[in-house]
Amino acid sequence: MALEEQDLEKADQYFYKALEQDSSEVLYELATYLEGIGFYPQAKEIYLKIVEDFPEVHLNLAAIASEDGQIEEAFAYLEEIQADSDWYVSALALKADLYQLEGLSDVAREKLLEALNYSDDPLLIFGLAELDSELENYQEAIQGYAQLDNRLIYEQTGISTYQRIGFAYAQLGKFEVATEFLEKALELEYDDHTAYELASLYFDQEEYQKAVLYFKQIDTISPDFEGYEYGYSQALHKEHQLEEALRIAKQGLEKNPFETRLLLVASQFSYELHDASSAENYLLIAKEDAEDTEEILLRLATIYLEQERYEDILDLQSEEPENLLTKWMIARSYQEMDDLDTAYEHYRELAGDLKDNPEFLEHYIYLLRELGHFEEAKINAHDYLKLVPDDIQMQELFETL
């Protein structure tokens, strides 16, 4: 055939010859073939020629118009198919698809409900359940999926109804039932998204061992699955497998070197493994692209304070941190560097917000005493002792003020 030989000029000649000479039946077969291989203009021309003999090709014309983005034209073709036609249910189903494409899911649902008045086709029930799930009508979606034969629907669509029911129950907060259906779906056919949903659900229920099991399945079977490493590393951390958690986080960073969440957990795990240098490096990389740097600045300040790197803490002021604890570490840095007046200014700004923090008050009190602000120191010592009444050293200091 000319098309198979990629001789388009010869194919064009055959096409117009067929239009002039071939019967409607032969043209119908040719049009469906052309439509199937993406030659929509030629298929459309034939369908328009034979539409009187085969009114069902209004469906094909509507589908082609939809492919071309001509939605109004597609609807116009579908309106030609009346309720007494054998193709009316198909027209309603295609209308539902078009309305969904237009973002009118409620109207699409109405069309499928109308179609179900004429037919109990499982694919219509499935389509309605899919729409209900999209519209967050999860209970209705579950009822729809439950009517269907899972194996039959999977063969026709590649989608497991058990999986869909599990997802819907998860959205309803019924996690125990959700995991039952998702596990059943996974037993019948492995699916990355199902395994990920199961792992995430078990993590949220603090069943970390089971979460690790399903994350490991993904890691073994589908290591290219996007984004599982963050949850997997967190689950391993909860199971006290710290070195393995860091390894998985690093594995994720090989795919996405600037993924903020992974950089933060890699920093955390490095810090817990007493590798402060790596912890700092991960934070510095994260700081470059993160939309919100507050947590990053707090962690950096914490590392610098432990290492008595007060100048580095003061340099963080250029980032204009808003976190109160980061600001307090800046105040403490001035205090440790004997710039007491500047430290005092920072402490005063923070005092109202951190008045219930005993450690803050303790440092503030000693700063006030050193600056000779004895009355203010006594007031704060009184507040401190309300929070920590058994601090003998502070009681003695209070009595001397």
Please provide the spans of the model-predicted regions.
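Start-of-helix register in tetratricopeptide repeats
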Residues: 25-27, 56-59, 89-90, 123-124, ...
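Short coil turns that delineate tetratricopeptide repeat
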Residues: 21-23, 52-55, 86, 119-120, ...
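Canonical tetratricopeptide repeat
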Residues: 29, 60-63, 94, 127, ...
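Canonical positions in the second alpha-helix
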Residues: 17-18, 49-50, 80-81, 114-115, ...
